């Protein structure tokens, strides 16, 4: 693992620090931007050419990251200081082997292995970290799924054991929905659906992400620093809007930090963790954890100072560089710059060479901006950008971010202009 660092080299020279990004989407792109600002050499890897992070990396490789030989060839050629997974579709055995050979897998291979599988994740949260979760059970056949849903009670949630972004998940309102839930998992999971997890429905006030970052302090000891919790909401199980700070009680906020600390202490390593939780009043339940920057955390591009977004925090931790913080009531907290919010810009058409319009209106809104990710292909539901807004009132930031996002229209080579339909879809107002 990286040790505390006081110096950095220069990219493309023999003094360079190198990172390999396994996954080159919008989150990897922001990590790459932060790395470029510190003179770190960036190697981007993904399954398709010209992925967002590849567009600004020093070098890139295209291949199937589920194949160990491909990963070994890239790492052995580049010999990076850190290997940073950004997606789930990675050969986990290869990560363990590379770690055994002395490479730094961020945060560590075991944490990545746990987080990419819902059964391993849930058992780690409930049994090792011993934090509150919703009630849950598992099912491997359709008959078992009927039994599991009856056991947990309706309504409940079913999720493929390996997937992400809501793919293969279903909200089961009654027995009549069980076959559809089974079919959804089998057809749409991004990974394995050999088993489903069935979870109790929590009637929460807000869903939050705590972006806990493990890093070295000034004494060379590993500590955990906590930014303010990020509120978010989803559509079809996928992030649609986020804001910071989440509107929760002080008591709930302290419980969020306590739960995140227990989970990240169990997982170990260095870097940022997106710990997803449900909050109702003062009660908090852990849901899932991602050992890397979280899509809801893009709000920190505005809410945190320059260089200290979740991506900057992740990179500092990975490189062994310091992160400022202040101890309050036993927790090391990272200060916000301003309340802020994001709202996604999603494709509703298919095709190559996406083109955007409405930017004159969108970029005329004070204290707001747009990030377009540079993905070369669109398909319905694919996230192609995000609107970001900031304001002293987080509610106003939410409103502004949604308005800006829905000002953007999209077309591709094979489809005419389509709007985001702001007037028809005022989710937050």
Swiss-Prot record:
Homodimer. The lineage of its organism: Archaea, Methanobacteriati, Methanobacteriota, Thermococci, Thermococcales. One of its GO terms (cellular component) is cytosol. Residues 123-319 form the ATP-grasp domain. One of its GO terms (molecular function) is phosphoribosylglycinamide formyltransferase activity. Its EC number is 6.3.1.21. It catalyses: N(1)-(5-phospho-beta-D-ribosyl)glycinamide + formate + ATP = N(2)-formyl-N(1)-(5-phospho-beta-D-ribosyl)glycinamide + ADP + phosphate + H(+). Keywords: ATP-binding, Ligase, Magnesium, Metal-binding, Nucleotide-binding, Purine biosynthesis. ATP binds at residues 118, 159, 199-202, 207. Involved in the de novo purine biosynthesis. Catalyzes the transfer of formate to 5-phospho-ribosyl-glycinamide (GAR), producing 5-phospho-ribosyl-N-formylglycinamide (FGAR). Formate is provided by PurU via hydrolysis of 10-formyl-tetrahydrofolate. GO terms for biological process: 'de novo' IMP biosynthetic process. N(1)-(5-phospho-beta-D-ribosyl)glycinamide binds at residues 26-27, 86, 295, 375, 382-383. It is an enzyme of class 6 (ligase). It comes from the Archaea. InterPro entries: ATP-grasp, ATP-grasp_carboxylate-amine, ATP_grasp_subdomain_1, PreATP-grasp_dom_sf, PurT, PurT/PurK_preATP-grasp, PurT_C, Rudment_hybrid_motif. The gene is purT. Belongs to the PurK/PurT family. Pfam families: ATP-grasp, PurT_C, RS_preATP-grasp-like. Mg(2+) binds at residues 276, 288. Pathway: Purine metabolism; IMP biosynthesis via de novo pathway; N(2)-formyl-N(1)-(5-phospho-D-ribosyl)glycinamide from N(1)-(5-phospho-D-ribosyl)glycinamide (formate route): step 1/1. This is Formate-dependent phosphoribosylglycinamide formyltransferase.
